[in-house]
C-alpha cells in the first residue's frame, strides 16, 4: 500500500492525540477500555475536524490546476463547509458554499450561529438553498460552479464530505497508518474503531487503511444519515476505489463495511433522547463535547454497544472524534436545561 505517492498539503498540526476515556470506561463497568482519537483538535483552521484531514489531499490538485475558488456544499450546519471556508482563507482563495436545508429542525437562529456563522466570518459566499438532505451530487452545487465560471473564476469542486472526490478517502487511509504508529508507542493494538458515517469517505478510508493489517471489519461505522442502505453502498464504492488507488493488494467487499444502523434516527440532523443522554454523559464524565448530528450519535452507539456487551470484555475501543462541536450552538434549545 502506497499513500506517499500522493501529494499532501499540510493543514493539520500532525498526528492527533489518543486520549484514554478512563472515567467513561469505569462508569460503563470497566470491562472495556475506551479511548478517543481527537480529530476535533487536529488543526488551527477554524476548529478543524475530519474534513481538514481529507482536504490535505485535495488541495494540491486545486493548486496544480490554478483554481481560485473552492466550491463546496452541505447542510446549514455543515462542518465540511466551515472547514473549506477556513482552508480557502488560509490559502488566499475565494470560497462559495451552498448550504441546503438538510435538517427538519426549526429554530430562529439555526442559520445564523455555529458553523454557518463561522463560514460567513471567514469570508465565504454563503448561499442558502431549500433542497432537502441527500448524500449524492447536487444541482445547486453544480450551479454554484457555473456561476463562478461565468464570473471569470476557476472553481475547484469539493463535494459533500469530500466523499465523491476520487481522493476523498486518502486522508483516513493516513489516519489508519497514524494509529498503527501510535499503537507501536502504546504497546497494544485497538480491537475496534468506532466512527460516525454519513457521506462515507471517512469510514471508507479507515476500512482500506485497517485492511492492511486485517482489521477492516473492526472498523464499526455508526450510521447518522438515517439512509443506511445508500450510505453503506457509498462507503463500499469509495473504499473499493480508494483501495485501488493506494494499491492495497486485495479487493474490499461488502463484508468489510460494518455499519450499525440503530442510532441514526429519528432522521439526519435530529438526535434521539439516547443521543442527547450520550452527549451529556460523555461531557460530564470526560469533559469532552460531542454534537447532536454526528459525534453524539456515534458516542451513543459506542456507549450502547458497551452496555449490551457487544464488545468482548478486555477490548480496547478507539472512538474517532471527527469534530462537529461548533454546531452545538444551533441546538441550544435542546440543552436549555443542561
UniProtKB/Swiss-Prot annotation:
Keywords: Hydrolase, Pyridoxal phosphate. This is 1-aminocyclopropane-1-carboxylate deaminase. Gene3D superfamilies: 3.40.50.1100. GO terms for biological process: 1-aminocyclopropane-1-carboxylate metabolic process; amine catabolic process. Its EC number is 3.5.99.7. Catalyzes a cyclopropane ring-opening reaction, the irreversible conversion of 1-aminocyclopropane-1-carboxylate (ACC) to ammonia and alpha-ketobutyrate. Allows growth on ACC as a nitrogen source. The keyword Lyase does not apply. Pfam families: PALP. It is an enzyme of class 3 (hydrolase). The lineage of its organism: Bacteria, Pseudomonadati, Pseudomonadota, Betaproteobacteria, Burkholderiales. The modification N6-(pyridoxal phosphate)lysine is found at residue 51. The gene is acdS. PANTHER family: 1-AMINOCYCLOPROPANE-1-CARBOXYLATE DEAMINASE-RELATED (PTHR43780:SF2). The active site is at residue 78. Coiled coil: none annotated. GO terms for molecular function: 1-aminocyclopropane-1-carboxylate deaminase activity; D-cysteine desulfhydrase activity; pyridoxal phosphate binding. InterPro entries: ACCD_DCysDesulf (IPR027278), ACP_carboxylate_deaminase (IPR005965), ACP_carboxylate_deaminase_bac (IPR020601), TrpB-like_PALP (IPR001926), TrpB-like_PALP_sf (IPR036052). Its cofactor is pyridoxal 5'-phosphate. Belongs to the ACC deaminase/D-cysteine desulfhydrase family. It comes from the Bacteria. The keyword Transport does not apply. It comes from Methylibium petroleiphilum (strain ATCC BAA-1232 / LMG 22953 / PM1). Homotrimer.
